[in-house]
């Protein structure tokens, strides 16, 4: 016969297993425009069952528009756009993305926000004429990420590099699927 303690332990273990099994495994969908872009930066759509987080927004409007199509095709609700670097090839596409997904939060660590604020005018003055129609209509500065992680459907995405020698260049580690 099972004691009350054993029954409680088994029930707790069963609930923990069921909760773990219920959490959808996160999936990654990488977009890289390749030679079609001045800077072939990779953007990554991290998707759960219903929601998604985008890491990096592309450089040109054309590449950002392709990214919008990819996100829409996923049928996921974009909750967050995370910007990992302060260089324009990671954030100039924000204008296009936020127009398509106005409810998505745009976040970056403080050092990235500081880097963008310090360089955006010069970067736009230099790259704008070279970009032509791909130039953003306006540049957006992300809100400051609080802490060192993002959450997608209860799963942590850890922001790494904030305590390193170049905190304005971070990356995202996803422990549940052991992916960067």
Regions found by a protein language model. Name each.
Residues 13-21:
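N-terminal signal peptide c-region/cleavage motif recognized by signal peptidases
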Residues 33-35, 57-60, 82-87, 110-112, ...:
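A mature extracytoplasmic/lumenal domain signature
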Residues 26, 41, 76, 83, ...:
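Extracytoplasmic
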């Amino acid at each position: 016969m099972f004691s009350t303690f054993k029954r409680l332990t088994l029930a707790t273990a069963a609930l923990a297993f069921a909760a773990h099994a219920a959490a959808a495994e996160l999936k990654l969908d990488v977009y890289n425009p390749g030679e079609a872009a001045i800077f072939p930066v990779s953007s990554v759509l991290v998707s759960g069952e219903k929601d998604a987080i985008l890491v990096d927004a592309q450089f040109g409007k054309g590449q950002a528009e392709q990214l919008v199509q990819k996100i829409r095709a996923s049928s996921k609700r974009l909750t967050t756009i995370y910007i990992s670097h302060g260089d324009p090839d990671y954030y100039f596409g924000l204008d296009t993305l936020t127009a398509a997904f106005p409810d998505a939060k745009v976040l970056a660590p403080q050092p990235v926000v500081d880097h963008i604020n310090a360089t955006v005018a010069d970067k736009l003055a230099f790259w704008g004429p070279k970009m032509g129609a791909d130039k953003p209509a306006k540049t957006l500065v992300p809100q400051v990420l609080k802490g060192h992680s993002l959450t997608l459907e209860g799963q942590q995405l850890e922001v790494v590099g904030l305590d390193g020698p170049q905190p304005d260049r971070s990356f995202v580690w996803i422990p549940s699927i052991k992916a960067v």
